[in-house]
Amino acid sequence: MTMLTCKPACELPVTKEENRWLVQDLWAEEAVGVIGAEPKSMKSYFALELAVAVASGVPCLRRFPVARRGRVLLYAAEDPLHVVRRRLEGICAASGIGIKDLDVYVITDPTLRLDLEGVRRSLDAAITGLRPRFLILDPFVRLHRIDENASGEVAPLLAFLRELQRRHGLAVLVVHHSKKGAGHMRAGQALRGSSEFHAWGDSNAYIKRTGDDTVTLTVEHRAAPSIPPLTLELATNRVGVALRVVDRSTPSVEPPSSIDERIIAILAESQEPIPFPKLRGQCRARSATVHQRLAALTLAGRVSKSPLGYRLVGGVQELQTRHEEDLDDPDSP
C-alpha cells in the first residue's frame, strides 16, 4: 500500500504578506469563490472591475491595490461581446488606462458546459496555454445543466474548479445568483442552490441593492478579516460607465487638490515621463491614492500616460516630443 505524502508542519511553505492578496482586501491570492447577488445588481460590473485591476495593475475601484498584475481569462455567458468590450472600456477610462493596456482574454465560444468532460479538457488546455492568474466565469447557471440544489451534482463541478486552481496556481471567480426574497438571510446562506457554494469559497463577495442607483458590497475571506461593507454606484464617464465607491466617511488622507498639485508640480519639473513607482515615491502618498488622482487628472486631460510613464499635457516633455516628431516628419513645415 502506498503511503500518503506528508511533511512536518514547520516545513510547510510561508506566504509573505504582500503575496496574500490578488486584490488587496477584496480577493485573496489563488482564492476560489463567488460573487453572489440578485439579478441586475451590478455583480458582473464588479467582476469586470476585478478583471481590469488584475490585468492592468491599477487599483480596483481606484482604491484597492494590486501587488502584481497578471493575465485574466474571462467567460461572460449572458452578454454580447460588444457589450463586454464597452463595459471594459468604461472601467478603463475611469482608471486612466486604455483597453490595449489590459491583459484580458475573453472566451468567445457560445457555450461552456463544465458538466461535460470534453469541455473541461478544453478549458484546462486554454488555461495551460494562456497561463492566467485569474479565471472569471459569469454566471454559474450558464455553465451546466445540473440540479443546483443537489449537493451531489454541484460538488463535483466545484471540485473541478478547485482542481484547476491548485494545478495551475490561479484564482477562480464564479458569478452566482442569490435566492429571491432572501434579504433576511446571511449573505452566504442566500446563495441560490446547494450550501456547497458558500463552503467552497476562499474569498466571497456579496452585493445587495440598497437603492435605485446604489448597492452594498460585503466581502468575506476564509483566512483573513473582512473590510467594512462598501456602498457602490455606477458613474458615467466619457467612454461608458464604471463602479465607484460612495465614501460618506470623513477623508483620512490629504484633500485631492493638494495631491493633484503635488503630482502636477513633479511632472512639470521633469524633462521625461515619470514611471508610476517613482512618481508615487516623490508624492509620498499611498499607491491607491496616487492611482486615483492620476486617473482623475488623465480623464480631465491634464496628464497623459505612455508606456514610459506619466507626463503633463502641454508640459515641457510633451512639447519636446511634438518637436521631435515634427523633425522626423518630412512633410512638416
Protein language model regions, located:
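Detector for small/aliphatic-rich hydrophobic stretches
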Residues: 1-17, 266, 296
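Pre-Walker A (P-loop) beta-loop-beta motif of ABC nucleotide-binding domains
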Residues: 29-30
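Short hydrophobic/aromatic beta-strand immediately N-terminal to the Walker A/P-loop
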Residues: 33-36, 73
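Phosphate-binding/switch region of NTP-binding enzymes
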Residues: 34-35, 44-45, 134, 152-242
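The conserved Walker
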Residues: 39
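Hydrophobic positions on the alpha1 helix immediately C-terminal to the Walker A/P-loop
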Residues: 46, 50
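C-terminal regions of RecA-like/P-loop NTPase motor modules
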Residues: 128-131, 166-168, 210-333
